[in-house]
Amino acid sequence: MSLLDYFRSTKKPNTASLAKERLQIIVAHQRSGRGGGAPEYLPKMKQEIIEVIRKYVQISEDQVSVQLDQNDDNLSVLELNVTLPDTK
């Protein structure tokens, strides 16, 4: 029976590998912050994004987060987080 149980078992995520992955994300994030800061256009882009969102939903500036992450592989990721109000 143990052989069948081996094939049936679903692998649970290893907490060590999950912690390692999260730590790598944090380190990459901190390294990208050291490289000269955010580009000049980022604050203006954030303002324009907020203006577009405000056409449809009432939000404040602290409900929008815009972040540009760059890594060594010449790859940039623009992360936009918007906290929308509850609709009832």
Swiss-Prot record:
Pfam families according to UniProt: MinE
Signal peptide: none
Cystine pairs: none
Keywords attached to this entry: Cell cycle, Cell division
Its biological purpose: Prevents the cell division inhibition by proteins MinC and MinD at internal division sites while permitting inhibition at polar sites. This ensures cell division at the proper site by restricting the formation of a division septum at the midpoint of the long axis of the cell.
NCBIfam families the UniProt entry points to: minE, PRK00296.1
Family per similarity comment: Belongs to the MinE family.
Protein name: Cell division topological specificity factor
Species name: Shewanella denitrificans (strain OS217 / ATCC BAA-1090 / DSM 15013)
